[in-house]
Amino acid sequence: MPPPPEIAARGFILHDLGSQQTLAVRQPDQAVPPASLTKLMTAYLVYQAVDAGQLRLEDTLPVSERAWQAAIGSGARALAAAGARLTVAELLQGMAVLGANDAAVALAEGVAGSVDDFVARMNRQAQVFGLKATQFRNPDGRAVSGQASTPRELAWIAVRLLTDFPQALTHYRQPALTLGGVRQASINLLLLRDPSVDGLQVAYADRLGYAMAATSRRPVGGSERRLVALVVGTPSAQARATETQKLLNWGYSGFDVVRLFAAGQAVSTAPVWKGSARSVPLGRTQASLVAVPRGQAARIQPTLT
């Protein structure tokens, strides 16, 4: 792999969603507090509940006193006053666009009945994902003892969110949220700066620095590529956007994507013992892609073993 450009960040990871390759890393396994990146897992479980029919986007949920308190003094914007009722869609968008802590807690209570039960679900899902270093203590990311993760594992949550529930981008890509006649711009400066960026979440904590999970989709060679970047330890909100954009730009300009096999393409056969046919075709239901350094595509010779 070619070396990435100089990125003013303590750690990062860049993932190509189509080829399922990691293109670049720096200290991806360092322990970090997840801060508001916690909301990626919160969002995953909410979309999972919607997908399972446990609640609907148009359902309304109350902003409890506990949810409202989560936003007070946290540095995150509050979405609504205690006692207000908002739809699941509004709460999801508030969490995505504004990083609203009260929205995260209200959604947790709406999905699981209580914050404690929701946090238990978060940690079970982390185990399902195979995450070894991630522990959640709340759904919004406020600093508490025992809440921890790594850039690699947070990036994997982002990848799974996009893979399993791509409809989440409907809320993450919004440049602003209008609620009660008040318009509030997204706190994701990169989304406002780069039209190819359509998510995901920004965060800040003393031990984390300015961090973000970002995703971008750009047309390349007649198709589209989606990249996911997770960057931690930048010195400011502006630097967070600038350095993440630099990493994404390199991911697109430094690599070509080669299609090894098309979806449904028969690439070999397997013999069948005493079957109605003597053999069956072998292939993949999805296209097989690989990202290679720019200019090296002609050297790729796919083989099946």
Regions found by a protein language model. Give the residues of each.
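Active-site-adjacent loops and short helices of periplasmic peptidoglycan-processing enzymes
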Residues: 1-152, 159-165
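Domain-terminus/edge residues, biased toward the C-terminal soluble/receptor-binding domains
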Residues: 132-135, 143-305
